[in-house]
């Protein structure tokens, strides 16, 4: 695996780890929704994940991440359509999809 790709995978792994640090209780949507700092920190880390994934796909278009395109699209939506991203969308990404991405990243790094 390319050195750059390894670095971008590490960036994704670190961003996922930070998201889980910012949101230890994944059962309290109302607390998440009312905490602006946490929301922005998580959004920023999703942007980082999306940008790293975009860079990976530019050098390795066939890279085996099942949701790669959706991740990049979400990053673009947060950055360019920030007023169109609901708290529920961000919450759903973290609670329902992030752990699977984390497993994929760990598998690829081993």
Where do the PLM segments sit?
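Solvent-exposed interaction patches of small proteins and small membrane subunits
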Residues: 1-110
């Amino acid at each position: 695996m390319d050195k750059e790709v390894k670095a971008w995978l590490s960036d994704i792994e670190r961003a996922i780890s930070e998201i889980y640090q910012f949101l230890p209780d994944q059962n309290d949507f109302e607390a998440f929704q009312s905490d602006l700092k946490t929301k922005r920190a998580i959004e920023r880390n999703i942007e980082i994940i999306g940008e790293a994934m975009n860079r990976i796909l530019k050098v390795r278009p066939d890279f085996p991440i099942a949701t790669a395109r959706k991740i990049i699209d979400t990053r673009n939506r947060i950055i360019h359509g920030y007023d169109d991203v609901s708290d529920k969308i961000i919450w759903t990404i973290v609670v329902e999809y992030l752990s699977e991405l984390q497993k994929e990243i760990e598998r690829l790094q081993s």
